[in-house]
Amino acid sequence: MAFRLIVVAALGASLALTGCDDQQTDRAVQKLKDFFNAVKPDALLLKGLTPGITTEDQIRSQMGKPETERAFTDGSKRLEYPRGPQGLNTYMVDIDRDGKLSAITQVLTAANFAKIHAGMTEDEVRRLLGKPGEIARYPLKPETVWSWKWLEGGVTQEGFFNVHFGPDGKVYTTSRSDVIRGR
């Protein structure tokens, strides 16, 4: 079934590209690559990436366009690759100042969730956990809740880690909630 979907998508894309000029074709091809990178299994997404050897260009070619890119004063970079909104992983890819891979870290872990504390800003949380899978605003409370689906293990396996921000944009608490499955 998944293979059929890929074949149909590729056929549709090739038909759409037949009447395009080069610039339109390049944009369409890039969008198609971004789509396939977004649905690519993690094992293929990360295959063959070697710290100290793999270049930033090779990473971008294999993993696609990052959700966020942060440049640091020492010349290094961090690329954010969330596998959501319903994915269970977010990868932070660190590039050294020479443009080589230095580390890949899956950040949706209990250890990282434990680092979230009252008073943190939205940017500080985003730097640590990446893009949330869901954002809910509750104007009457007032609060904004960011949620990440993750593999927590235990009885339910998957759960949501939630960060609650007050009207000042700062964390005031965290919580967890179950993933509700169909009945």
PLM features: residue spans?
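A cross-family detector of function-defining hotspots
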Residues: 25-40, 45-98, 120-183
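Bacterial N-terminal signal peptides that target proteins for export
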Residues: 1-7
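C-terminal motif of bacterial Sec signal peptides marking the signal peptidase cleavage site
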Residues: 16-19
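Well-structured core secondary-structure elements of compact alpha/beta domains
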Residues: 103-108, 145
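A short, polar/proline- and glycine-enriched secondary-structure boundary/capping micro-motif
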Residues: 105, 112-117, 182-183
